[in-house]
Regions:
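A short acidic, Gly/Pro-enriched loop at the edge of an enzyme's catalytic core
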Residues: 89-100
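A short SAM/SAH-binding and catalytic strip from SAM-dependent methyltransferases
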Residues: 100-113, 136
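A short glycine-rich, Lys/Arg-flanked "PGG" loop and its adjoining helix->strand segment in the class I
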Residues: 114-129
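Conserved donor sugar-nucleotide recognition element shared by glycan-biosynthetic enzymes
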Residues: 17, 21-25, 67, 113, ...
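Conserved Class I S-adenosyl-L-methionine
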Residues: 5, 20-21, 47-49, 166-259
Length: 259
């Protein structure tokens, strides 16, 4: 899933999608002990929503993402931050540059999650922490219904292609095993329940269309077909007040680079 796809509708992603994950961001930043002066690397930082929360805790934040359009918004949100275009598999930083690093819902999209995890471990100081998050199992996330609605509209992945599935690391122990493969020592793990809430069905549809998967569906099958599929899939989650509320569960794991 290319960076160009994630950059098609960056403002909708920034305003309609990222804020829904605030409780997850806050929980993990607390687990990392992010505070005054922490040198934090946010890998796959998107439009910088989590970076702002980290800065509010006193962190000196560097964000990396492959999508320039999202980084433009991150710079608007946090002028004091440093935001760099780059790939998770080849971080453009010296060894031991950061006190801690975090990858919110990012490693599953890496070309090689193991390589990306090792890169994250490389740039953290000995004794420093790395946290990663992802969806729990698909059946525990109501938003899976919307992801599945787009599957028939997207092109089939090339044989052997990987790194494009939202649930690639969702099985129990998946994150922990990945971080261990990078030579990190487990510290803690847990789950965070979230409600993805939108005032209207149209907002819920726009949030999904702003993702890389949404952009792929539009490119392959047209916006009208993608909107229709998502609108239908969202109906079970419409409240009497007309809002859309989807209950999801995310996993996180925290590990330490050995001293």
């Amino acid at each position: 899933m290319t960076a160009e796809m994630w950059g098609r509708r960056p403002r909708d992603w920034a305003e309609l999608a990222e804020p829904s994950n605030r409780p997850l961001f806050a929980t993990v930043l607390e687990c990392l002990g992010v505070g005054e002066g922490t040198r934090l690397l946010d890998i796959g930082c998107g439009s910088g929503y989590a970076a702002v929360l980290a800065a509010e805790r006193g962190a000196r934040v560097t964000g990396l993402d492959a999508t320039p359009e999202l980084l433009e918004i991150a710079r608007e949100r946090l002028p004091a931050g440093t935001f760099i275009t780059g790939e998770m598999d080849a971080l453009p930083f010296e060894d031991e540059s950061f006190d801690a690093a975090v990858a919110f819902n990012a490693l599953q999209f890496a070309d090689d999650p193991v390589v990306a995890s090792r890169e994250a471990a490389r740039v953290v100081v000995p004794g420093g922490l790395l946290a990663a998050t992802t969806f729990a199992e698909p059946e525990r996330n109501e938003s899976t219904a919307l992801h599945l609605a787009l599957e028939p509209l997207r092109p089939a992945p090339a044989p052997g292609a990987g790194g494009h599935l939202p649930y690639a690391l969702s099985e129990p122990g998946g994150l922990e095993a990945l971080l261990s493969s990078a030579g990190l020592e487990p510290v803690s793990d847990g789950e965070v329940p979230l409600v993805w809430g939108h005032d209207t069905v149209d907002e819920a549809v726009r949030a999904v269309l702003a993702s890389g998967g949404g952009a792929m569906a539009i490119e392959a099958s047209g916006e009208e077909a993608a909107r229709a599929a998502l609108t239908e899939a969202a109906q079970p989650f419409v409240t009497p007040a007309g809002r859309v509320e989807m209950h999801n569960v995310f996993r996180y794991a925290v590990a330490r680079r050995p001293v």
